[in-house]
Amino acid sequence: GLYFDLAARTEEQKRRVREHVAALTDHLIDHGFRLVDHDGKVTRWGTFDPASLNHDPEWWEERSLNSISILSYLKVAEHITGEPRFAEAARKLIAEHSYAMNTLIAKTPFGPGSGNQSDDEMAFMCLYNLTKYETDPKLLAMYQQSLRQRWDVELPELCPLFNYVGANGLKQSAGDWLGESLDTLERFPLDRFNWALKNSHRKDLVVLPGFASDSGDRVRGHRRNGQVLPIDERYVNQWNHDPWRLDVGGDGRHLADGAAFLLPYYMGRYEGFIKD
């Protein structure tokens, strides 16, 4: 959606975006809200149909996230193409299969550090679209509530990307998250090599119990204020990493890119959270 709105400058560029987005979204609709690969099989996480999400116990954990995802895809396709079939598909999922209600069923955490950042990143990206493009006040309020629930869980992780998405979707302009986001960006290491880091020996940290998540033998914890370590005291590749992990192995042979900084930085500037 943002590429179409901000980056595609010419009508030819916009036409190509429309065709590409329409083809992908039509594929999902034509295959019963499933992403089917060239071998005829549904991809690992490409299940968005009501029978699976609402009635198959194998998929109940994905009910909320995948409902958010498919509604986001349909809303972006509607926004970009203006085609009523995408709005009608979303209306059917919402009216007949309670997909908007599904978005409110956020994961129940077992305490600090028990989330899944990959799922959270997907949810935040999709909720950014839904809160940006939805015009129905009732649906917008539901999407904002879903975002609020997820943002509350993410706040201790000091992630500027999640904070800016949350604040933008909820129309907030001030809070502790604002200074914490700027602090994270200011501290963000210029050295993007994966050097080994060890913090588990520190006496100023609280070690999380093993039941918080299935992390194997990884030692996980936080500062005594309940927040994760500052960004320059841990390694970050992308924002779907585990920020609660205290020890990170590495030998300096992997170079991460700069997207983890650039995406929240420019989002913060565009949405007005970062001032000159």
Where are these regions (language model features)?
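Terminal, non-catalytic domain-edge segments
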Residues: 123-276
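Long, well-ordered core segments of solenoidal/helical folds
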Residues: 19-39, 85-107, 142-162, 223-243
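Positions within ordered alpha-helical repeat solenoids
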Residues: 6, 30, 34, 76-79, ...
